Amino acid sequence: MLMNYSTLFKDNAKVAQVGIIGANGGFGYSFLAQVPRMQDSLSLRVICDLDMDVSRKLLESLKYDSSRFHPCRNQRDIEQALKTDDPIIILEDGTLLPFCKIDVLVEATGSPE
C-alpha cells in the first residue's frame, strides 16, 4: 500500500513539531531528508544523537538552514532556543527531550530499549 502523505495531512491545521533520536544512522538520514517535503505538516524541532558535530554536519548536508541550529547541553539552553523562531535543537543527551516541546518523537536508534 502506497502512503500519500499529502492526502493524509491535508486537513491538519497544526504543523507537528517532530524530534528524532538516533538521527545519524540510515533511517534517520532518510527521515530527515523527507521532512522538508512535508513542511506544511511537519517541522523538525529536535535532533538527538551521540555526537552534536556529526548531527550538525548531517543537517547541513541535507540543506537545513544553519541559522536554526541550537546545540543544547541543558534545560536552560533549550529554553533559550525555544524563544527563537523555528529552532532546531541539537542534543546529545536524550534525557533532555521532555523539555523540547515536541509532538512526535521518531526513534531511529535501532535499539528501542
Feature names for model-found ranges:
Residues 1-113:
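N-terminal glycine-/serine-/threonine-rich beta1-alpha1-beta2 phosphate-ribose binding loop
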